[in-house]
């Protein structure tokens, strides 16, 4: 750790030297042919991380590098990026950016958008930028969706602090999570994996509903979440973030980028977070949050040959220790009983390499090779229950892409190979599984006019345990007019079941695991549509988005906690299992620098449990979200607030328990309010905020907390917040 800190400090004192300066201005041309300065345009030298952004007048200054000719890359959300050749002797330049031909409905009024829909993608993809992520504490991925209506995040139990996302009303195991299009956070990583992604490392999150691209595998049933991390050639050179909450959580992040040569650059990212003090506000003898110590390190490299070859490669190392459970002894018959302790130790290593080749004689043809290896070792103890897991995973993909010069036709072909080895031990039993699955895929994109794109795709995978999987998918995008876009999608998905790893929350209970049918894989169809419409009100865009998605399972492993209060049963679906998800969202700039977003989402999710078709337990039926953001004229003060109304839902029956251990069979709606104030001082941001302002907490979330080793103990029936109101403050330093 000392060596790491020394390296980071060394990078901060590297002198860039003295160089000539290029001065310039970036603007657009409005309807009256007036020049309008663009604020916050990204400007950097090609193949380097040396860059800057334009100021309030569209002006910028940038030191020249030793290259002749110089190539300047200029980009701005909603506009066509440009690469400008700058003669070495030129010291001043004017740059004009033009609105993207397929983004005519997006009006950018002097500031970059913090959240927007990718109008070029046939899939309905929402881009959450780093600007949006900064509107909340966002210490890790689980805290990155507080201003997003599509994705829910909730606690999995009342003791470990584990969180899980939900998309289209279904658990996160049906959503494929990727790191820059490489599958990650799967299998045994699923339970605590959201905490392994530091918020300050991310530059954007892409959320796609429905069936994803076949090029990324067959796992996405409800959607895909793709994470973009900071890169060695980004314009940010140094970054530091410090965060402290009133619940005794400390979060520290630092990263430094170094241009080693014209072709090679590297980025070091370091993260640590720790909670060293517990508390018990509801007086049930259990800590309301776990003690956590995490160390997270990543080293990324980027090589650019400028001759058609590009490579990115890196390594990530994670060590986490998590302690939870009782913080005071219980008493039985006048004698003290040893506290119920939970200990979870995790070591995780991940390597990746992405290689791209562009053929000089075929400028519209490219080939890519992606390699990824993961290893994770986790040892855990829940009271008297011991659970240990090991994951060894290898992923490779070779992809070939070509398109016609007019971009009417393009095709993507490729093959992949995935190897996963799971070794799980639970209460003396060993669950060992090796999965080997080569696959091939093809995806065709037909776009005869800019308003229309039809993308059919299919893949075939050969699973060593479960046979052949055929995965067809289709995406269609049609621009009804310049302000209205309709997207339709449909497709099949598969996933292997990891019975223990995906249900660790039930280890924090006395429920016995009853496996009626050995789990294998799950199979489902997803289909739906997304309609986006822009209206012009007071020369500002009023966006309305409506979508509907349905998921039908053909094969599913049912997790039943209704049939027996002392068991969690696993068996094959015999009947219906589906999800209908409806969502409407509006977004508008009420007046200059005051942005508003409001959304309503309703989910109808039912599964056959024995002879009963029941609503999914412990999940809200609807969600209402309102976010308001305001910036002062100088944009040195930022104010962000979110109001979230969580709807009611069903609680599994506890009628078999003694009266004192019974719970109502439903929960009521509740409100959650978050707010944050940010002060910008040159390269420093100071921020202060509050989460769960109304201090709402689920009453008595742990059943039989006074007898944790008894037969009725259950900490898994969680539907609301466990800890109450939380204040936090922090500091961010970013040097370009």
Model-derived regions, located:
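Short, acidic, small-residue-rich periplasmic hinge/interaction motif at the N-terminus
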Residues: 31-34, 39-46, 73-79, 89-134, ...
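Short acidic/polar hinge/loop motifs at secondary-structure boundaries
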Residues: 60-63, 164, 182-209, 297, ...
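A beta-strand signature from Gram-negative outer-membrane beta-barrel systems
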Residues: 93-95, 196-237
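Extracytoplasmic beta-strand/coil segments of soluble accessory domains associated
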Residues: 142-183
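Flexible loop and strand-edge segments within Gram-negative outer membrane beta-barrel domains
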Residues: 274-296, 302-367, 373-392
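Membrane-embedded beta-barrel scaffold of Gram-negative outer-membrane proteins
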Residues: 366-380, 479, 487, 520-572, ...
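Gram-negative outer-membrane beta-barrel transporters
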Residues: 447-450, 548-552, 572-654, 732-734
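C-terminal beta-signal and adjacent terminal beta-strands/loops
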Residues: 596, 645-654, 678-736
